[in-house]
């Protein structure tokens, strides 16, 4: 039995069954739908203050301080129940050390106190999405999330409840008035159509932290078509889980088109990184689009690049929590056929064949 040192000031929780196994995670559902995952096989101490989680200390003496978020509930998840987590025994030299960013969808975190990790979730459906927010730029670096049978439904309509993200300090967040008269749409990264299991889940996609200023023709054109393609991959015949990153370029001067009069940074490119796991096998693809007001090709293969190439263009390490051997293999190759990407000609032929079969 691994001994867990827990400090309780006024909160009492029984962890007897968990401490006997000392593996898996404790998932804390915190106030305002935030979650925090504690990795038990590295845990040294959990500190509480009243009914709030305050600090996690691990056996390597790293500490993670939580800003006194009130605990709504705690769930224990055994290793076998954590979907698609790589083995702790696998060699992984570039993984995120923050347990909050240990799932496969997370890119490598950018260091520095001005880069915030924000997570939105619901108790019923788990993590809605996570994002990295650059306070110095007041901009989203990336949004990431998973798609699988348990968190993608068709229960709710679009809510359109655009609002500020109060998890970001007031001085560093974007506000609704910045988009008014800017000439840009509030472009979703995690789209509302990907999160329709519940009203709260759908509403969470409308935080401005999940937006980038986007030309409407791009937003309703090529970006929307690529979003639809991702949802087409989200079926049990193709995947067990999709790990999705959606983002726009904010880090390099030559990949920024400028700023609006209200101070919104205008990305020059939008992109996606998709990892698919099916029956224990992985494949990955990058999708890269120029952000402009022109009409873009309907041939999705023109946007497809390898993850290695996407990393070269962005400077971001995607899917860093995979074991190194798997990461190196899947990120270096691009198999268009495996992703079943149709050219416009193939799409028309598919529609005609479908119609003839139903006549």
Regions found by a protein language model. Name each.
Residues 29-31, 41-359:
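Domain-level detector for secreted/extracellular nuclease and nuclease-toxin modules, and
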Residues 1-24:
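Bacterial Sec-dependent N-terminal signal peptides
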Residues 21-38:
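Short N-terminal segments immediately surrounding and downstream of signal-peptide cleavage
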């Amino acid at each position: 039995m691994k001994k867990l040192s827990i400090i309780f000031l006024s909160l009492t929780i029984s962890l007897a069954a968990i401490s006997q196994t000392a593996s898996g995670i404790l998932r804390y559902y915190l106030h305002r739908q935030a979650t925090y995952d504690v990795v038990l096989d590295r845990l040294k101490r959990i500190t509480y203050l009243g009914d709030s989680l305050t600090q996690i200390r691990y056996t390597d003496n790293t500490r993670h301080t939580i800003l006194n978020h009130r605990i709504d509930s705690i769930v224990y998840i055994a290793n076998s129940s954590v979907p698609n987590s790589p083995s702790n025994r696998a060699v992984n030299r570039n993984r995120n050390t923050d347990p909050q960013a240990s799932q496969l969808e997370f890119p490598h975190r950018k260091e520095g106190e001005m880069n915030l990790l924000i997570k939105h979730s619901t108790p019923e459906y788990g993590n809605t999405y996570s994002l990295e927010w650059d306070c110095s730029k007041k901009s989203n670096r990336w949004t990431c999330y998973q798609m699988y049978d348990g968190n993608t439904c068709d229960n709710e309509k679009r809510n359109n409840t655009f609002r500020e993200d109060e998890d970001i300090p007031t001085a560093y967040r974007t506000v609704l008035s910045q988009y008014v008269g800017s000439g840009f749409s509030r472009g979703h990264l995690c789209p509302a159509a990907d999160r329709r299991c519940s009203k709260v889940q759908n509403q969470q996609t409308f935080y401005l932290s999940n937006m980038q200023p986007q030309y409407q023709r791009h937003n309703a054109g090529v970006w929307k078509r690529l979003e639809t393609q991702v949802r087409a991959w989200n079926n049990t015949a193709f995947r067990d889980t999709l790990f999705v990153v959606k983002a726009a370029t904010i880090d390099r001067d030559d990949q920024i088109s400028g700023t609006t009069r209200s101070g919104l940074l205008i990305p020059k490119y939008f992109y996606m990184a998709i990892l698919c796991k099916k029956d224990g096998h992985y494949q990955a693809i990058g999708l890269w689009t120029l952000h402009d007001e022109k009409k873009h090709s309907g041939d999705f293969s023109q946007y497809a690049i390898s993850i290695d190439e996407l990393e070269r263009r962005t400077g971001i390490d995607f899917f860093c929590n995979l074991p190194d051997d798997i990461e190196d293999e899947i990120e270096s190759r691009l198999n268009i056929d495996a992703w079943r990407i149709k050219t416009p000609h193939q799409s028309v032929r598919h529609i005609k064949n479908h119609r003839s079969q139903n006549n």
